Amino acid sequence: MFAFVAASCGSDSSSDSGSDDTTAQTDDTTDSDTDTDSTEAPAVTAPDEVETSVVAETEAAVYGGSVTIGLESEATGLRPWEDSCSSPCYNIMRSIYDPLMEQVGTGGYAPFLAESLESNEDFTVWTLKLRPDVTFHNGTELTAQTIVDMFPLQQAGAAASSAIAASFLTDVVAVDDLTVEYTLSESNVAFPASLASGPMGYPFDPAAAAADSAGYSISPIGTGPFVIKSRDIDNETVVERNENYWYVTADGDQLPYLDSVSFRPIPDEGTRLDALLSGTTNAAQSLRQGTIRDAREAGDSIELIEFQGNSTGGGMYNTAQPPFDDQRVRIGLSKMNDQTRVIEALGGAGISLPTTQWFSADNVWWTQEAADAYITFDFEGGVESLQAYINDPERSDGKAVGEKIDVELSCPPDPTLIAAMQVLEQVWSGSELVNVTLTQFDQATHINNAVSDIHHAHCWRWGGEGDPAASINPFVADSAVSIANFVNYDDPEMVAWAAEANATDDFDERKQLYANIMTRINEQALLWYSGGTAVMIAHEPGIQGINGWTLPDGELGVGIAPEAQVRWYQVFVSDS
């Protein structure tokens, strides 16, 4: 049996400053720095533009107090098996649910609600041991049978079904009261990452969920540090301290420290920052470069925790919708993506660098091969590619030869996002070959449009701080099964590469396989990129524990990675 420890399949190292990235230097091109016997990836240096190290909290924690945080949007729902979740949603979910596994500062995964996780030799059977004496908020005990009973709901869930398919999970069995055996149809060395994610890794009460699924989204029941108190959608969600929370620190402190946390969706970036500066809220989340710039200039009344790693802005083409089913159109539009101007419109000058793949240039998974395949700005080349499609009598959109193509370009209604989309619109329209319609929907609708495949050209964020399999494998999986294949592009070779990467713990081999996928995505022009996404939690002085949280075994976590997500169980308000 192989015991799963924090070193496995990690992306980076132990002190964050942008995703999982950290402060010890590593040359990505040097084989000697990679430990191929374990699957731990070496540490890397984060960009100078964003500098926040993750260090353990040293100040003595204090019980009591409340925090109100402004989020960039409302949660699509609070059912981990059903609702597609982004960063604001996970900020709420992480207060209510516990993950079975959690990411650590070394980039790998360690047990959280689990006590241990082991695999067989070919990574097709995983055995998980739960912590004893854990109860849900309604008093129901968490057992191995709970995990088994969750599985049918997850198989039918919109969010979990695609995650299950991508993980190759086929069966879940209770070995005893606290031992669960997961059986996979194929090898999957990255399976622990699935148990750290919401769709598969957040235990919920299956009986209550089956009895009233819609109600569960309003009154979710988890094992987490806080219990839902009230949920006023689009206004405020309030959670209060779980007096029976299982997590007791090495110093004997029963978590959490706070009495309550309030989550307020404030979609407008300026309004959200102003709410913090005026004292209406105590903290604010942002994934917008312009807001980080403004917060930096706001003075000493607030403190910033920043992070930049494997999260890149950009967008995608839905290949199920003509004319995006034709590579010539995708290449033509991508050659008209002026990354420098888009980054400036986003307010990211001096903060973000242009990206070419899902990994930042200082990350161990980044490759020159994928970077060289990325389509860079070439207006004349873009015109030539679009013209070839427009003049084709067999063009897929059914229009007459010579007619312009129609493009609906959609993004949420944030001013910087609108400005960035206007840069694209001006260049695309300026070719005199494209009719562009700009649309804006709130983030929840924007996500749902992608999930339901009614999108065309759609702005999006790409990447992730954990094992690449967690984000890439669902993206390349069968589009009929995986909702994460937002581009609806099915490539058997990419599926095979992802499967091969799942079947080995050799880092160099896995890195090449994911480089193949990133290169193919660029060659097919399925996505366009802008720059790396810096993220931020800004807060009033005195709020502690956001960035330096630890796991039950004392190991340091990953700070606010990914994408400005807070683990609320160790946050406290200092009295000093």
Q: Residue ranges of each PLM-predicted region?
A:
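Surface-exposed binding/hinge segments that line
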Residues: K129, A163-A208, P225-D232, K335
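Ligand-site clamp/hinge motif
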Residues: A214, Y245-D294, L433, D442
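Ligand/substrate-recognition segments at binding pockets and active sites
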Residues: A388-G464, F507
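Long beta-strand-rich cores associated with HINT superfamily self-processing modules
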Residues: I537-S576
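Gly/Pro-rich hinge or "lid" segments in bacterial periplasmic/extracellular proteins
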Residues: V104-G105, A196-P256, S260-S262, E380, ...
